[in-house]
Amino acid sequence: MNAFMENETEANLYAARCLVICAFLCAAAWLLTVFRIFILPLEIVNPTMPVIIFFFLIPALICRRTGGKKGWVKYAILFCSVMGIFILSSAMPKHGVMAWTMPLMLSCHYYSKKLSRMTLIASQILFSASIYIGMFVGEWDQILLDAAYYSG
């Protein structure tokens, strides 16, 4: 196996482990919300958190099946990370903003400008969409609505 394939396999396994940690953090935040330690609307958190956790766990299952050696695995991992953050940011706009750096950081492990650029563009488009989706179906944020109204 050449060094490039070995690096890609290693990056796939590392990214999958990172997303498992993200899934555990989401599960912990969900439990803290259910026990009313975090103050988030349960009608938003209860339907979205299982979907987010599912998206974050899919790469670990794929890597377990394939060993992370297939060429398409990196695309599946980055797709799942972007979609998980998109759902999080749509449901909770205030809390999902910083999480948008995660897919880009994961894409940097592959040492591919094209892949990082593609991840950045997808993240920017979905981040913009999540702001508008979050205004209407996500957690209420009057400041976000005022900013959208007064900016044009």
Map each language-model feature to its residues:
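Short, Lys/Arg-rich, polar N-terminal cytosolic tail immediately upstream
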Residues: 1-10
